[in-house]
Amino acid sequence: MSQVQIADIYNPLVFAGAEQEAQIELNAFLSSGVMVEDPRLTAMASVGGNIGELPFFKPLGTEEPNYSNDVTGDTSTPNKITTAIMRYRLASQNNSWSTMDLAADLALQDPAGAITGRVGQYWATALERRLIQSTMGILASNVANDGGDMVVNIATDASSTITDAELVSNDAILDAQQTAGDHQSGFSAIAMHSVVYSRLRKQQLIDFVRDADNNTLFSTYGNLRVVVDDSLSAVAGSNRVTYTTVIFGNGSVVSGMGRTTTPSELDRDPEKGNGGGQSTLYSRRADIVHPLGFQFTSDSVAGQSATLAELSTAANWERVWERKNIPICFLQTNG
């Protein structure tokens, strides 16, 4: 039996659909409800341009209402319903893999499914990292510009032994949620480094629930779905590591995937391998990942798309919603 070649199984339309389905299924922030697709962003991502605006209505306020009376000369003055915008930035991304990279998958019983699964996993991880670095950017902006009113930081870089007061705990997580005041009931998921997750497990604060729809087992902390990701910030100081845990509400991050001219293609180089030939699979995406309540200012972006480092830069973010209306908070601990 001859070996399957990537050209034998590659169909651009089928591949694009299967790869997108795989990345959605494998993205922990999508499956937890933290990130949701916004049809407006998907449409905007397909029309071209790197920067766009997402309009929103400002809250009506909480001022005391008028009191009705029977005086014909008394009239009420209507308040204005005002709008504002959140600016976002599109990320045009691509990557490629050679036949040698995919050789193991080509030998499997379902090579097409194996390859699209691997590429889908790659893009799921890439989008998760864009989400995480965006939240690190709004954390940095919050500390720099808004007095850190979204973060509780109990970590230190002291040379002494770490105390319980500097470690994650039930009280510390509740304190972080309290930064949202009476809006804290909107929190639905908590993302943490595996070191923090392990400590909560040792305290027997993590439960496991099986999804009735797809029989998937997932972790919960109280009423919060748990996402464990070691790409969350773990900054080593002179003496200690500071871990950042992020608590989200449902749909606190919106996303959109635009249509690229050629989402994927296969290129054949017959001269490679001293004439043996090599096939290269290219995958391209146009994505928007945007935390609600903030605008991306692009004040410190060098290229057409923001890199992960630029997403985490405080100067590139500005809060445009009131703190209580943003279902995101942060907890920084030494473990």
Identify the meaning behind each predicted range:
Residues P65-S68, K202-Q203, G237-R240, G258, ...:
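Short conserved micro-motifs at the rims of enzyme active sites and ligand-binding pockets
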Residues S76-T82, A212-R225, A302-R323:
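Short, cationic low-complexity segments
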Residues V34-L41, L174-A176, S264-L266:
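Short alpha-helical segments and helix-capping/turn motifs at coil-helix boundaries
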Residues M1-Y88, S185, A314-G335:
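N-terminal "assembly arms/tails" that initiate or stabilize quaternary assembly
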Residues L54, T82-D146, D182-A191, V195, ...:
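Long, contiguous amphipathic alpha-helices that act as assembly "spine/axial" helices in icosahedral shell
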Residues S141-L224:
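Extended, solvent-exposed, turn-rich assembly/linker loops in the middle of proteins
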Residues A191-Y197, L205, A212-T280, R284-R285:
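Extended serine/threonine-enriched, polar tracts that run as long, contiguous segments within proteins
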Residues M1-A28, T245-F248, R259-G335:
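Protruding loop/beta-arch "assembly-hinge" segments enriched in small, turn-prone residues
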